[in-house]
């Protein structure tokens, strides 16, 4: 094989050292390059107006091959200054020809071309590719983050809708809607006690087993009389009038409408017996003054009553007649003459104190019934008959007790459901309305913030992908430039070694 047929393989990382070791370029080539770049900067200050030049000079880095192109363009623009000897009188042409000679001296152009080629292969192209990959990754992550925000938004919207549903409001005007739903609270109480008569056998069984006939007094009262006022439960008689404390919804200005900032005083329109209240307190009725001292003495005037009176003897009037026998409630007895006020005006399920006692009793009854069912199951599975558990089995077997327990659990569920709890707190806690309104407002703001964030992330994703696309022509131009430089280097070295094939290893892909 001839020497000319043996290829020359040069690794890109060792290209510059190879050129110096073969004494193709000097070691101090950097000083010559700095001088050349200084002259290029000065020459660029005086350039003719030409579209080709403008396009060429738009490149950031001017190398030897650009200088050769500039000279070819100047041959056209400066042809008027050309002498018969082939020289140019134009200073522009002289400057660029001098730059070209400096490049060709000591093969400085080859050293610079090798530097640019190595820099592009090792840094510029990988850097652009990494930037593109990073932008693509950021776009994917941003898109995923925007998609992940759908889940918390849906959860908050579901919680918001659930809370509004529990409260029975739409959320448009909370103050007015709170007032409206609170008016239906007595109906909720009545609905929760529809089947309370079914637990009477359980109460009787508990009283018989415990030996205490006065056990569970509130449940007994509810079964017999229903959800009456606390006044009736305490005094064993219905009040003449009910003056329930006004309800105060302390909603802040941001949570209430302009016309609803006043204190809400709600009249539920029901008395303790479930009917429409039409009683009026005796304190506000003016009966007039009919004392005997103010009546004029008369013999009855000229009024003929149509009654024939017979002469009678003087009769002594007995004022000690028991008015109770005639169903008369005397003013001054009971509480302000039979008017339920304050906490006693609330119903048993509506009173904070008595509601807790009711829940204690209903849970106590539930525990007793569960224990009773457990004991009956143990009795059935045990070979030794426990005589202490034989009482009432004939009338209350496991199935009958289970039916009572189902009724008890239904009452517990209905009296302790979310809507009843919210409305109860809303009525008796002045700050609860504002707390609910604030919570709803925070949910709404959270959803708005999530939506704004998602839109911002979507916009950022679009921008990142656009930046990624903008780098495509940059990368293509770098690759094209690098391949051109590689071709120049291989051809130049090949000429120096009898046109042997030169391969730059590790070049651009």
Curated annotation (Swiss-Prot):
Localization per Swiss-Prot or TrEMBL: Nucleus; Cytoplasm
Transmembrane annotation, as ranges: none
CC per GO annotation: cytoplasm; endomembrane system; nucleus
InterPro entries documented for this protein: CDK5RAP3
Keyword Transmembrane appears in the UniProt entry: no
Keywords: Cytoplasm, Nucleus, Ubl conjugation pathway
Function: Substrate adapter of E3 ligase complexes mediating ufmylation, the covalent attachment of the ubiquitin-like modifier UFM1 to substrate proteins, and which is involved in various processes, such as ribosome recycling and reticulophagy (also called ER-phagy).
Family statement drawn from the similarity comment of this UniProt entry: Belongs to the CDK5RAP3 family.
Protein name stated in the entry: CDK5RAP3 protein homolog
Source organism of this protein record: Drosophila melanogaster (Fruit fly)
